[in-house]
Structure formats: C-alpha cells, structure tokens
Amino acid sequence: MSHKRLGFFTRLLDKTSPQARYRLATEQIQRAERAGFDTAWIAQHHFHEHEGGLPAPLVFLASVAAQTNRIRLGTAIITLPMENPLRVAEDAAVLDLLAAGRLEIGLGSGGTPTSFLPFGLTSDQRREAFTNHLNTLLRAWRGETLGHPDNRLYP
C-alpha cells in the first residue's frame, strides 16, 4: 500500500483580534506538525472576517514556514481573479524556496460575489479572469518570456 498523507484545512475564525487569529492558526499548524500531519491548508478571504479574513495567505505561510520544519503548507485557495498573476507566481516561487520546497498551491475562481467589486471585477467575470490569470501564472512558472524576451520569472 502506498503511503497515505494526512492533512488538515483551517480558517481564521476565532472570535479575537486579527493578530491573535494569526498566532492561533500558527500554533495550530505547529501542533499539527508535531502530531505527524503532512500538510496544512489555509483559505484566502478578502474583507469578511466571518469567512476567515485572510487576505494574504502567502505572507502568512512565510511566517509559518519560518516556524516549522517538515509540514507542507498549502493555499486552499488563492482567489486568482483578484490577484496579479505575476505577483502570485513570484511570491509563491520565493516562498517555496524559503520553505525548502514545502509549498502547495491551490487556486480557485472565488465565491463571495461582493468581494470582486473592489478589484474592478464582477462575479460574472471571475471565470474568464481566472483562465487568463492562470495562463499567465503557468507561463511564468514554466520560465517562458513575459512581455519581452528578457523578462522571465526569477525568484
């Protein structure tokens, strides 16, 4: 039988300050690592504290990576239509290096319809934006040129 991997998913839902939420989630992931979990996954949510309120998952996971050693760290999900795909590609590449290859990336088109408006999108545009941003992100990760022959992702 192949080795089974055990992971868990968490959201920042504790009824406390944002700073305490990040601390508690970090401690939860540290405990999971000590308990033998293989992966920890977090969700991205813009604007809505009752949904987990974590607008910058890669920044948070960079902190967690510095405080853990083995557990793989994943995004479930980054709402790609709301992000600059080149920034996601660069930030993820840097974080994966800092985390010694422990980063897992999950991407999605998003859910909360009102969250798209501040990013200049409507909820109806999210699928097309996701497809376009995913193509750009994958081109960057494959090392393809980006807008000019001299431009390639360098983490």
Question: Whereabouts are the PLM-identified features?
Answer:
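N-terminal beta1-alpha1-beta2 module of alpha/beta enzyme domains
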Residues: 1-67, 71-73
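Internal, glycine-rich beta/alpha segment that forms the wall or movable "lid"
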Residues: 2-4, 84-155
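Active-site beta-loop-alpha junctions enriched in small/polar residues
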Residues: 11-13, 45, 78-80, 108-112
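Short coil/turn segments at secondary-structure junctions
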Residues: 12-16, 79, 117, 121
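Short, surface-exposed alpha-helical recognition segments that flank or form part
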Residues: 16, 20, 83, 125
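Glycine-rich "substrate-gating" loop/helix at the edge of Rossmann-like oxidoreductase active sites
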Residues: 48-52, 78-84, 122-123
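A generic, residue-level signal for flexible/boundary positions that often mark functional hotspots
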Residues: 67, 72-76, 110-115
